[in-house]
Amino acid sequence: MPLQKNQVLTLTIERLSNDGSGVAHSPDGEAVFVPGTAPGDEADIRIVKDCGRYAFGILDTLRTPSPDRIPVDCAVAGPCGGCSLRHLDYAAELRAKQENVVDAFRRIGGLDVPVLDALPSPEVDRYRNKVQFPVGRDKNGAPCIGFYAGRTHRIVPCPDCKLQPGILNDIGNALCSFFGAHGIQPYDEASGKGLVRHIFLRRGAHSGQIMVCIVCTRAKLPRSAELVEQLTAQFPDIATVLVNVNPRNTNVILGTETHTLCGPGFIEDTLCGVPVRLGPLSFYQVNTLAAEQLYGIAAEYAQLQPDDLLLDLYCGMGTIGLSMVDRCRSLIGVEIVPEAIDSAKANAARMGESVAARSRFFCADAGKAASQLAAEGLHPDVIVLDPPRKGCDEATLSAVVAMSPRRVVYVSCNPSTAARDAKWLETQGYRTEKVQPVDLFPRTKHVEAVLLLTKLNVERHIEVDVSMDELNVTAAESKATYNEIRDYVWDHHQLKVSNLYIAQVKQKYGIIEREN
């Protein structure tokens, strides 16, 4: 029987979905997704939408709180939509993230692979090195920083975001006070009037340097010299102040024109010892300390040897590959964003002549570049993949297989697409050895993962005797199917074999390939 809008059910939350919502089931077995709940909560849930096979609800009354529920320490955690898990104990959050990675690999990848416990972030709060505050007005009409409420462009004032270092919140508030004191108006989307759209701040986790970028609808910022003088006197760690111009009616934060009011126009920092320069357009991991943990796992999985060639696809600013360059003979990086490739080359140069000489970076689509490199006969020993959320396309994965690396290290920001891609690679002679979830975004639904895939080698894997009698094959002309072989090996040896591996064994022993 369909659930009705505003119907109230008493349900127990069983787990968290991959978007951070609690999952319960109605008496008829229909899944109900409820944000702001914790596994173990017993609550009255009000249905807001029934989609047939599943429904969405909201928390009406919490009857019995979960042992994993904690007090929310931010007044706008719900409305702002940023910290979807702020009500959950951090240990429970890590368990939920690990379980979601396991679920993705089983449900989407069809893979029962070892998924390790999620690696916690060194900092649970105040961990972000970048913030983009939309500028609006508070209830008194004064300029304020905040965040957009979920699925809207309504700004929720937030003077102290718990995910940002306190100094970045302080700078945002100081700028808004200056704007209010001097009549500098926030931009209003509805009317198209006003000047200041966003305050974009970066802070080097190791250097402490701060970049201030004020996004405006036009280049001229009133009293800019006075603003710079006051701001740098109050916050001496500010290394540069910029104005970015974005006059368009768009959701995109930054425009294409940037003017430097003071400093070099960038800040400097390091990531796993790689020196980086960061401007407004730089793509950079927002949790430096956790990213260094992730890169350490990637290097451990790569197991590079001194004579190895490392190929870093989707290399960005080159930081993953450059963090491993001292362990291998040479590095090739590929990235489609020209500014990122320029940064990668500059980062390599700052690491010294030896690193620069052994590192090459190319601006190209990862799939096309990988296909060309494979066609040219390139055979890297290890390939690192760090694709966007959509994962890799089949052309890229096919090129990876053609280049035949002994190891593939896959860094993922979306376990679902990582599981899909791992499933495809397993059909082509690679085995997913293990998956390490890494929490780069505490208090939010997001989780990263590092996968290790190794190339199967018919000469190095154990031999398994398969009896035709055990497979119930009686006719002399019959052959065991691939599925029968896979099932037999799993039932008797708890080993997984791919179609390519079976074909390699058949070819080695002269077994003719037919319909099986």
What do the PLM-derived regions correspond to, one by one?
Residues 22-27, 146-149, 213-215, 344:
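Short, acidic/hydrophobic/Gly-rich beta-strand patch recurrent on exposed beta strands
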